[in-house]
Amino acid sequence: MSGPGLLVELLGEKLVNSEREEADVQALGSRVSLIGLLFGCGMSAPCLQLLPGLKDFYCKTRDRLEIVFVSSDPDQKKWQLFVKDMPWLALPYQEKHRKLKLWNKFRISNIPSLIFIEASTVKTVCRNGLLLVKDDPEGLEFPWGPKPFCEVIAGPLIRNNSQSQESSTLEGSYVGIYFSAYWCPPCRSLTRVLVESYRKIKESGQKFEIVLVSADRSEESFKQYFSEMPWLAVPYSDEARRSRLNRLYGIQGIPNLIILDPKGEVITRQGRVEVLRDIDCKEFPWHPKPVVELTELNAVQLNEGPCLVLFVDSEDEGESEAAKQLIQPIAEKIIAQHKAKDEDAPLLFFVAGEDDMTDSLRDFTNLPEAAPLLTILDMSARAKYVMDVEEITPEIVQSFVTDFLAEKLKPEPI
């Protein structure tokens, strides 16, 4: 499919401007090289606050890019009032299904969010577009394509004894990029565990280093927090480099631990979950598994997009492992297909046993108590898809997933 065709598939054939006049998406794809998808809501104070600065940025760069507003407004009149103040385009209000697909595709968890994509390929250029606008308000670094880790991290790194070393010393090592701050209680809790994980990994003979990218609000709090850590940090004074690292990995919240391989490629963005799950670090460097067991630690991933969850009777010994083996070939195939296109898989895959967390999930989503129970949960759309049969086979799972991806299944409300 051609570039404009990919954009039409993503956004539909028509967008609207502030006067509700239609704009042709295929023509848009031929006119600009970048599209900024602005996820927001007219009832959100942060969304209202960002408009003046974003308008200035847009006026300076509109010959090279277009912004498309993707609304979360529950009321069309409020949407119309908000869109009226925007110099850019918007997804039509009635395109609610397409809006949800965009939220899921780009793993939007909070608003406002601004995602820059290539118009020709619809591949993501920058996940943290609002930070990009703040860092480069004149658009001097356009087109902001992702740079390799070694280039973004380049420069001196420090230890808490004030010793300095060049970032080039990280070459050939696994690296954990740790986004954290003293003012954040979950960060401090994770740091205590991470100090022990760091020690165990180093003692096992692995070449591993952690680099702190601070989100502290003062140099004093940074120094106090960093004094507890045996690893490296980007100097607090180097705000530009800290910001570039946040942009590179699309950081939306802390704590966040990104694990890189010795070539600087991302192994997992779920370092926090892995450190807390694998206390002895026996599975380091924590390559992602196609199917994982749903726990309190990773349940937050249910909010990242549609998730296939197979509920099983965990009192039956070996049932969870058998369920994983049943799903795994299907999960691997889907993950590989989308990885080849440099895309995230459209589904995450979980097996859920019986515990308090699973009971709470069943209650929240109003699922029957049956086991096995095959479901797809889409929390952002508040929708569920349920396959309640006596026996779950690979053929049933494959058919269920295929029909979901083809949008042939009828959702039930959560």
Swiss-Prot record:
It is an enzyme of class 1 (oxidoreductase). The keyword Cytoplasm applies. Its EC number is 1.8.1.8. Its main location: cytoplasm. GO terms for biological process: cell differentiation; circulatory system development; negative regulation of protein ubiquitination; negative regulation of Wnt signaling pathway; Wnt signaling pathway. It comes from the Eukaryota. It comes from Xenopus laevis. This is Nucleoredoxin. Residues 131-305 form the Thioredoxin domain. It catalyses: [protein]-dithiol + NAD(+) = [protein]-disulfide + NADH + H(+); [protein]-dithiol + NADP(+) = [protein]-disulfide + NADPH + H(+). The gene is nxn.
